[in-house]
Amino acid sequence: VLRDSDGEVAFSALPFSYEYAAREVFGDETISTPADVIEAQLTAARAHVPKGARWVVVAHAFVAGGAVGETERALTRVGGIETVPAEVFEGADYVSLGHLHKPQEVGSANIRYSGAPLAFGFDEAGDQKSMTIVDVKKDGIDVRTVPFRPLRQVRSLTGVFADILAGTPTDDFVQVILTDEIPLIDPMKRLRATYPNAC
């Protein structure tokens, strides 16, 4: 619990947990889904939030409605992908989520993935990276994003070897897809002279 000019702000950090572990920790054999796990964690956390305090929840979860990229794996269980409905977070003033790489709101403006600061795959080429700044006020939240450019971007280049080799040198992470019709001998070694982080 922290204090600012508007009073107390309680923070609850919920660790990712599988159902079997949550059943043991909470002594509740009815926990059978990721939503049940989050609900049990929130019930326990809520008991420690002082009356009148604003409440910020931090969680690693796959919340229904989130936009998934190529490199994020769904939290899959027997029977399908298990998502957590946004409604389980009702009562929290702000929910800061981790798992999905693209910054996005899920369910409502106070439930948000901040996004990954670095690209994890070439499907994220061209995505604007940002950080999320949240002001949790007594009368609501103010969310703003601050865009930034990581030291290295990810890019995908497609074309014939000679054209790509003649491109502008960069330290970015570059995926190279060659379209030459004849086999080339060790093209990667030569490409790395121009693109040291090519793959």
Question: Where in this protein do the model-derived segments appear?
Answer:
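Extended recognition/assembly regions associated with phosphoester-bond processing machinery
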Residues: 1-199
